[in-house]
Amino acid sequence: MATLFLYSNTFSFFFITLVSLALLILRQPSRAASCTARPVIFNFGDSNSDTGGLVAGLGYPIGFPNGRLFFRRSTGRLSDGRLLIDFLCQSLNTSLLRPYLDSLGRTRFQNGANFAIAGSPTLPKNVPFSLNIQVKQFSHFKSRSLELASSSNSLKGMFISNNGFKNALYMIDIGQNDIARSFARGNSYSQTVKLIPQIITEIKSSIKRLYDEGGRRFWIHNTGPLGCLPQKLSMVKSKDLDQHGCLVSYNSAATLFNQGLDHMCEELRTELRDATIIYIDIYAIKYSLIANSNQYGFKSPLMACCGYGGTPYNYNVKITCGHKGSNVCEEGSRFISWDGIHYTETANAIVAMKVLSMHYSKPPTPFHFFCRR
């Protein structure tokens, strides 16, 4: 695998900023101290928050250089390091979420489980690993955990209790694949946006099912700017670009989806009055990274660090990151996009910092709200 895009200004303002970010995200005793109960998190989603489920469930090869930074090895994450969900867990001083499908090791999922699988959509609902299937997996997980916890006094405390499930945080980050696949099938913009109400309905139904299982605290991420992904830009011959070089139609569809998701959260706050529903504007955060990339020390914000093809996007669907012939940049910290679809650890760290700031949550809520008693 070749290496390209060398940069020498290692001690730039960006790296000073990055150190500050690390301190903010990973060393926040005030946040951790606010958790008076053990944090329990259940996550549902796609590759943006998959911490190894695709590899564990299907044996799909996600090899090096994925994971080359923090983990120093591939862990099944589609990034050079940590994902947003990893930084959020670390902000609470809790261990990183293990994939539900990863049965190896001695984990008992005491701090929750991750049901997210790369490539997962909301529709069709009965195809692995759609959101519907992930919620069914959770139902089985909960039932089995409570069964084991009640089977022996010696096992009490080793598994999540009924109160643990009730007080847990339920995170959902899904919908991107539904929109992207519609465009990939050749559907027009109008055909794609007609699917959005169905997608929103399925997400709402899944949240209500989790509520029926006892969940009361929900953390909902909207989708990012699809039209700014190097993968989409490299495959679509279009002059329909905005001032930052992103595809207007893709981003417009994502924006309409996000508006529907926001409205859904408003409805759920009325329908489920004893539940807390937090909506996070991930789109605004990620688009700001691209629009203000120089301020964050990024170069070529629409170019993948790992891929093939060089400028302007370094993405080729036939030679993707980690495959024979692909290249990888030396300093991923100068790139927003890792592989043309997913973000670098550096970009994820900045996204996490902004999520934790409460400026992008509706209503403004600290991430640790669910583990305060």
Curated annotation (Swiss-Prot):
Subcellular location: Secreted
InterPro entries, alphabetized: GDSL, SGNH_hydro_sf, SGNH_plant_lipase-like
Residues making up the signal peptide according to the UniProt record: 1-32
Keywords, in A-Z order: Glycoprotein, Hydrolase, Lipid degradation, Lipid metabolism, Secreted, Signal
Source organism superkingdom: Eukaryota
Glycosylation sites: 93
UniProt entry tagged with the keyword Glycoprotein: yes
GO biological process: lipid catabolic process
Active-site residues from the entry: 47 (nucleophile), 339, 342
An example Gene Ontology CC term for this record: extracellular region
A GO molecular-function descriptor: hydrolase activity, acting on ester bonds
Primary site of residence: secreted
The protein's Enzyme Commission number: 3.1.1.-
A Pfam family recorded for this sequence: Lipase_GDSL
Family: Belongs to the 'GDSL' lipolytic enzyme family.
Protein name: GDSL esterase/lipase LIP-4
The species this protein was found in: Arabidopsis thaliana (Mouse-ear cress)
Gene: LIP4
